[in-house]
Amino acid sequence: MEKRTIVKLPGDGIGKAVLDECIKVLDAAGFNAEYVEGDIGWEFWCKEGNPLPQRTIDLIEKHKIGLFGAITSKPKDDAFNELSLELQKKGLVYSSPIVGLRQHFGLDICLRPCRSYTGNPLNFIRRGQNNSIEEPQVDVAIFRQNTEGLYGGVEWSNPPAQVYDALMTHPKFKKNFGSTPVEEISVSTRIFTKNATERIIRAAFDHAVKFDYKSVTVCEKPNVIRETSGMMYKMAQQIQKADYPQIELWNTNIDAQMMWLTKNPEIYGVIVAGNMFGDIVSDGFAGLIGGLGFACSAQTNPDNGIAIFEPTHGSAPKYADYPVSIVNPIAMIESACMMLEYIDEIEIATKIRKAVAEVVTEGKVRTYDMMKMTGKADVINNGAASTQEMAAAIINKFKA
């Protein structure tokens, strides 16, 4: 097996703990890799005024594949106030380093699969006929456009004259906001491009074909956000009709989708959405399979081969200073499995997933979230497994 070089990006908070344990699992499963660490996150914002240093971008450019832990992100003013006076004088403005990575490398295809593990005590259940308890199997692949939309970062408070003048050419803006003083206005734009929209839609349909899903659902809000959401649904209709007639195309509004996923989640296969709605609906489905401790993701650009794999949870800084790490590493480990599949290490990915499934089903080792505890330092004393113990239990399954 060729030895791979992987850029590890621990980031902030719990990112280091889950990534360290994930790498132990990869090593024990037989993945032959060398890891180089990239600097990213809040520490480097405070030290250097840049949470995504150029040296880290260069590392990823060179090695192509990254495993990412988590980052802390704070509002603009809070971030500015944590800088030294010397850095504050430079007029620096904080921006999320993970968003920066997506935009710099064009990581516009985000896949967030949500699959339930048998025996997970956090799985979604409902009442069926005759008051019976049902636990539907959830297996949904959510494709999120990762670089555009409301997360694109094109926004202003007290917009400059050119922007304000352009907005005033729109009759609805002029009617509803024209009398509002410009200094009282903040604007965040929602920009969709046809090229990026087509790429994410085709990625969703290709995934449905490859893994035998029967439907692709566009989850947007075209009845209100007519231009951007409308463009996505119209383009999906055209693409499905021309190239994927064997796959059903469904359309749901994001608000209705959040209701329906708690009623009949098993009917959905592949879902495709813009940046913000993809973020929302994937967290909704993650709640049905155990929460963010089980939610993984891949962010890829097929054109340049660069890919970043990360759990969808945040850095949870309140847990980072506990004497023993208590967080669930499965989301990070699942993200690594997605990485293995991406680089054609299918056998190792399957081996790890089988071990995770056995540990979850067996139920002997459970982190605090799986035991429905509040995340406090004393959960270990009350029977919850630590991050390290969960990883060790998975590794022990390789030896069985």
Name each model feature, range by range:
Residues 46-173, 276:
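N-terminal glycine-rich phosphate/adenylate-binding segment common to multiple enzyme folds
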Residues 34-37, 211-220, 244-251, 345-353, ...:
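Flexible, glycine/charged-enriched surface loops at secondary-structure junctions
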Residues 92-95, 261-364:
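Glycine-rich phosphate/nucleotide-binding loop
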Residues 39-45, 228-271, 275, 279-280, ...:
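Active-site rim loops that border cofactor/substrate pockets in soluble metabolic enzymes
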Residues 32-57, 259-261:
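N-terminal beta-loop-helix "entrance" segment that forms/cooperates
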Residues 5-29, 164-254:
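Glycine-rich phosphate/diphosphate-binding loop of Rossmann-like nucleotide-binding domains
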Residues 22, 26, 236, 332-340, ...:
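Buried hydrophobic packing segments
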Residues 12-15, 64, 143, 204, ...:
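Buried hydrophobic positions in well-ordered alpha/beta secondary-structure cores of metabolic enzymes
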